[in-house]
Amino acid sequence: VMSAGNGNLSFYYCYEEGIAEKISTVPFSHSIVMPEYVVLLSADCENAVILQSDAVSYFKEQFFTVLQASLPLLNTVDTASLLSVFIQLSSETSRSYMLELQPCLTAFVDEEIIQNVINKSLPAAQQQLLTATLLRQCSNLKRISDFISVFSKRGLDDFVEKGIVYQVPLELYQPPCLQDRIKMLQRLIDANETGAKKFYMIKDTHFHPVFEIFTYNSSVLFSLTDSLASDASICILKENTIIDSFQAFLRHAVSHDLTYSIEETTSIFKEAVSRLKAQCDNI
């Protein structure tokens, strides 16, 4: 769905499947509503019909009906709100394949870790809300049985060396202490070794993800976070072909040597734990 006015162009995505299916069955499924006439286009854009001004009001009404079932195709949200988007999409899914800048660390926090890192200068109500949000997201992710995360080395290094968690705005927390980082990494190791989750680190020589992709049973989320982890540009689609394509891409990356194997990735996690334990011993 596209709307243009006053020199501005906006794109919307129709989330109401029934409306989309109804439109797709019409021979001329695309329409352009102008002030004085309406242009109807066939699905392949090879044929067109021009309707005169008496059709404008009818097609405007149809357009706004579709628009009411639509949301902006691209949206910018603060990172704290992005956690709520993740919760909404992951709450009823049994499958999640992810291309991430960092392994999915929010799946391995607990209330003790959250209380250790949360910014104590935040209002008490905000601290409680953030704690509840993170715990709910952790619960959702733990429940997902078919779970694959393909992530970058840079993101893992930032967590191990600096305690940075990309999915949480920097002003909301302080870096986890060495012991808490070890605890979270150990949970990553346990997930890989038991098969509860599957984490694969991307080989640096192959590709570097710039944005993140999160696929679920019936939706896919594209996310690009700014350098301060304060805002994210997001796009949510609910097209089965797109979901299937990106899940197939991630399976291809895993099976065609673009990533380290589960065993190799687990060894990398263990090496990181050893480095952190050595730092603890030197304190």
Indicate where each model-derived feature is located:
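Hydrophobic protein-protein interaction segments
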Residues: 1-252, 258
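Charge-biased C-terminal accessory regions appended to nucleic-acid-, cytoskeletal NTPase
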Residues: 246-283
